[in-house]
């Protein structure tokens, strides 16, 4: 890397050297020499030497089976360490300004002052600030929890080594510790031997909260409070809750038969247990700190005649939390539950802790109150008694199946065969009725019983424990009403947000019409109390129509939903189902939020954070603080300095781009007769299905083709062979078409003046930079029948044409010109990803020759898949 990134370069070099020592100790000098030869050949091949590229291919082809796994692990492990060094660099004191965006909030406040935004308006926007991140297990973090814990400790060592005044012995000790951690990682199994259960995934989510967010959220709020104090003259109210967490882990049953109502109940108990456990650690720390004697009458009343009143109150809370852990333990084990008071509501913690806080301030000890006690109070608001709120997600047809079976049993016809109007009439009638609908003697099928039992589990919980009920593949108003009816029948005592997820191109285009129909129903308007959540699906719409067309459909749907809710005086929260990759809506958070339609963030931000992106954005407390800063500044900016309304000619051209790109995408994916055989042969799609990643099957329908593949394995497969097809196909072709039609000037204007369009092009540039056409060609030659080669060649030629079109519109000479750090980061990884790709192609070739794949080859293949995912940084 160039000298600009000297500190990062130094850390990468040190970690690489320590990894080399570990490899030598474990496998001998010969294997280390082999790894080093491959690395050097990869570097010179990347610099343009065809001779060295051929030598690299031959070197990898000649590896005996017993060397494949250690060589693959060497490069995979190095990429993990590089990611760690890079993540650390973004929070280190040596980080360059254009890399870190160290103080997004202060930058925003300067911008607001220059734009004459009043402090009153800013204060109001801060009061309304609402960031809800929803942790999800898919595409499933490739790295195991074991590895992640080691990487967190490696980060701590890097932090120590950065201190200027570190003593020689301390440096030596820290470097030794680093080497131990790298050796531990090397000798641990990098790949799970069995698929994680939904319970394992939920525990992974809780580990993220414990290791990072428990510290990161109060730290962010402390910094945010200081910035507000400086800019507005008033800080953040103590009870403010601008950030909170939800989760799909253990609640998302869409296409995952392993998430049952029993699992959901267990995950919710576990979530409460983990919350009580973390609060108990906080309370024990506060007991050791708050030894003060002076207090207000209110605290004296709570503490009784104890000499140390604060400790007395905290000890009461310690008992409450201890009893809570005991009770939840018994419930999870199915044992007799002790009859003791336990934590069920956050106010049980908040009220006594807040009384202590006010008392300390009143008695002149504000500096003490504003320390650990304030952090705990912030946590109580952010995490509640349940740590994370659990969403329930289910596919729309599972609800209509319940009603269909029920109506047939009742002898009133088949719900599924009714018209939409008849369904709505029936549902509204039943929702307004005071008598129960489910007959006592009815014995439904197991699938239907499971849906009913899930609704009953929801009804058992407190409202605070739950997020929203998300209906995937929502298409009609009756899909939403059906869930409300099933929850009512289950005895749900509170109003739960029922959130339709519009995810295909057609469904996005119809979303406004569906919501208008719902808002026209009196029962519905009365029930929702002027609040509506709608989820925008990014992954399936992109898989259905390509990224350009899907992006415009998402934008148009958001705009239409904002308009209809404004007209009806309904507060709208848009829930974004983004992933880590562009093919699933992934973009740098700040840019993505500022490219949304005006007013679309008025109701706050609710967004999924997926598997591996959770680690990159939230995996360390300091990194989480940076991420929250970016989210908060982007939402405030979008609401206080909204982006321009798109001009009509921009909209018209976007319609053309959308239509042309969708047609170009579908002509290949649906219209090309060789496409499916090519996809199956040129990518590890079939092998990926066997990888023990997430708890969820790779296909919605195990017998279906590409169309039944989930969006995640679809994108994951293409990113493995470096063609990354779903993330660009159709977009550049549409841009070139518009240039040919004489619209270049208009495209350039859109690029300059419209954040939505410039962000699209920026995302495309990043994808193009990650593509490696030469590598894709190597996969073709090694793995596909010669009859399929012309299709691969056509796609790669299209990619080159598309890159020229995008650079032309942006007036750039090369990709990522405006993002040198991003470009450098990808370039650094390529040297290590390329050998993994060649290894993977070789392994796929060897395993496909065998009737029964040897465990040796299967393990090596899994390591390459995990390594390439680490190198590409966003798996799916």
Curated annotation (Swiss-Prot):
It holds the Pfam family PEPcase. GO terms for molecular function: magnesium ion binding; phosphoenolpyruvate carboxylase activity. InterPro entries: PEP_COase, PEP_COase_bac/pln-type, PEP_COase_Lys_AS, PEPCASE_His_AS, Pyrv/PenolPyrv_kinase-like_dom. It catalyses: oxaloacetate + phosphate = phosphoenolpyruvate + hydrogencarbonate. The active site is at residues 138, 543. Gene3D superfamilies: Phosphoenolpyruvate/pyruvate domain (1.20.1440.90). GO terms for cellular component: cytosol. Belongs to the PEPCase type 1 family. This is Phosphoenolpyruvate carboxylase.
